[in-house]
């Protein structure tokens, strides 16, 4: 018995499908969601969102948002959400370098916080893109 998942950003519906399991990065740590899970509303962190369907894990890079869990449905409202094959590694690497440079400059506390958030997002994108390469080489 699968659970219906919708991942939505301001720009688009990223995914609408029945899945077997969801593993999400929340403010309180990683949370695994299976069908008939207890209702839950939680804040999502920047991180890797793993979706399992038919024994295959598909990683997404998300940059925060909210997750509503009902017994047979999960809705994720994400700031951004990208599948591994949607990530431009060169762009993510450039964003990582730019964020590290801004952190080194330490212009203001606000700029530092924004640069750290950009760095976390770029690192997650790079990790998810690498996972796809590793899985492709393994298969």
Swiss-Prot record:
Q: Nuclease: is it a keyword of this entry?
A: no
Show the CDD domains listed in the entry.
F1-ATPase_delta (cd12152)
Coiled-coil intervals: none
Membrane topology term = Peripheral membrane protein
Task: Note the InterPro entries from the entry.
Answer: ATP_F1_dsu/esu_C_sf, ATP_synth_F1_dsu/esu, ATP_synth_F1_dsu/esu_N, ATP_synth_F1_esu_C, ATPsynth_dsu/esu_N
Q: Which GO terms describe its molecular function?
A: ATP binding; proton-transporting ATP synthase activity, rotational mechanism
- Cystine crosslinks: none
GO CC, alphabetical: plasma membrane; proton-transporting ATP synthase complex
User: Would the keyword Lyase be found if you checked this record's keyword annotation?
Assistant: no
Which subcellular locations apply to this protein? Cell membrane
Question: Which keywords does UniProt give here?
Answer: ATP synthesis, Cell membrane, CF(1), Hydrogen ion transport, Ion transport, Membrane, Transport
Instruction: Tell me where it mainly resides.
Output: membrane
Functional summary from the UniProt entry: Produces ATP from ADP in the presence of a proton gradient across the membrane.
On assembly, the entry states: F-type ATPases have 2 components, CF(1) - the catalytic core - and CF(0) - the membrane proton channel. CF(1) has five subunits: alpha(3), beta(3), gamma(1), delta(1), epsilon(1). CF(0) has three main subunits: a, b and c.
Q: Which family does it belong to?
A: Belongs to the ATPase epsilon chain family.
Q: Would you tell me the protein name for this molecule?
A: ATP synthase epsilon chain
Organism whose genome encodes this protein: Roseiflexus sp. (strain RS-1)
Q: What is the lineage of its organism?
A: Bacteria, Bacillati, Chloroflexota, Chloroflexia, Chloroflexales
């Amino acid at each position: 018995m699968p659970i219906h998942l919708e991942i939505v950003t301001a720009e688009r519906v990223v995914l609408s499908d029945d899945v077997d399991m969801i593993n999400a990065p929340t403010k309180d740590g990683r949370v695994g969601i299976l069908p008939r899970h207890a209702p839950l509303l939680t804040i999502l962190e920047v991180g890797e969102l793993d979706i399992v369907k038919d024994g295959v894990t598909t990683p997404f890079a998300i940059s925060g948002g909210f997750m509503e869990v009902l017994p047979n449905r999960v809705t994720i409202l994400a700031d951004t959400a990208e599948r591994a094959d949607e990530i431009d590694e060169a762009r993510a690497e450039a964003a990582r370098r730019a964020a590290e440079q801004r952190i080194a400059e330490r212009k203001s506390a606000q700029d530092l916080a924004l640069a750290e958030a950009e760095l976390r997002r770029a690192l997650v994108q790079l990790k998810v893109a690498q996972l796809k390469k590793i899985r492709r080489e393994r298969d």
